[in-house]
Amino acid sequence: MAGRIQNTIRNFLDSESSGGLLLIASAAAALLVANSQLSEAYFGALHAYLGPLSVQHWVNDALMAVFFLMVGLEIKREMVDGHLSSWPRRILPGAAAAAGMAVPALVYLAFNLNNGAAHGWAIPAATDIAFALGVISLLGPRVPTSLKVFLAALAIIDDLGAVIVIGLFYTTGVSLMDLGLAAAGVAALVALNLSGVKRLTPYLLLGLVLWFFTYRSGVHATIAGVLLALTIPIKRTPAKPEATVSESPLHLLEHSLIKPVSFIIVPIFGFANAGVSFSGLGMEAFFAPVTMGVAAGLAIGKLVGIFGAVLLLVKTGIVGLPAGASWPQMLGTTLLCGIGFTMSLFISLLAFDDVLLQNEAKIGILIGSLVAGLAGFIVLRFSKRADGRNFSQ
């Protein structure tokens, strides 16, 4: 019996979809708690201070820096040694990601250009890689591997775009002295890389210093995670010429972070930030411009932007559809890109100081992501392959 339970737990942890499922559960739990008799304790705990920061700030500024470290490692690995390692491979997901960020932002601005909430334009521009891949993996072999690769590549480029947006548009009150010290930390990390240092310990220690001064500078501290990731060596250790690329420092660090990030950090973030108390909000909150802009941006803007870009590139002969994929399958995959949970929530906290606007954005994220996720799942579940056969056949 104990062995069977252990095997069940192990299979869950090894499943592609389990991280997304756990994130869904943590978000649902946050919503339930925030609207129960425990709501006061929930919000009180988030705003309680541990040292210099509140619990919510520790989650959003410190734990999420580790999440962004893993995102940065994924970006570098794919650019150097993966699905984005050549320009032809980057064209389709790159163009789709760019359009998939621009169109949702425009949809949001159509609702909020003149009402003081325009600063939230980037909220629906992000795709949640954990959720999207979690949903598509639930369909198993019904979805061709090429589409999973396309979705992963698009989401990674989307994450890179989100990181750039956060750095450029959601940074205020910069301290030049601390920023200079953070830059010195980056220079030291680059020097380690160029010197051929392969041990991870010096990089991680300097990464902590970089995080501290980045946080102090006013630039969002999570950017430190990405900068650290880009300096981690991906080449094999010279002393082990027989070693595979998968034994590089970057791959080893990424592998060690996957489960802690997927099963601890991201669910904690979801639980700490998805809680919206509907008490006193009223139905008008569901139809507020911010709510409508975010929901429409995710559910409609992502679809129009990404599918439109793919359609244009394929019909003009620049690229072809992913191998074995049909247009209905591409449509379903595009819909899944409208799941914008983690990164969208994160940007909403940076965009708005007003709790009411934050709550409206969260409602929009939940509605848009739910509609996009369900629609994408249904379309993919009943789509036919490029050869016309049902996946169930």
UniProtKB/Swiss-Prot annotation:
Family: Belongs to the NhaA Na(+)/H(+) (TC 2.A.33) antiporter family.
GO BP: any one term: regulation of pH
Catalytic activity: Na(+)(in) + 2 H(+)(out) = Na(+)(out) + 2 H(+)(in)
Subcellular location: Cell inner membrane
Physiological role: Na(+)/H(+) antiporter that extrudes sodium in exchange for external protons.
HAMAP family from the UniProt entry: NhaA (MF_01844)
Short name of any one Pfam family annotated for the protein: Na_H_antiport_1
Name under which the protein is recorded: Na(+)/H(+) antiporter NhaA 2
Gene3D superfamilies: Na+/H+ antiporter like domain
Keyword Cell membrane annotated: yes
Transport as UniProt keyword: yes
Transmembrane segments: 18-38, 53-73, 91-111, 120-140, 149-169, 172-192, 208-228, 263-283, 294-314, 332-352, 363-383
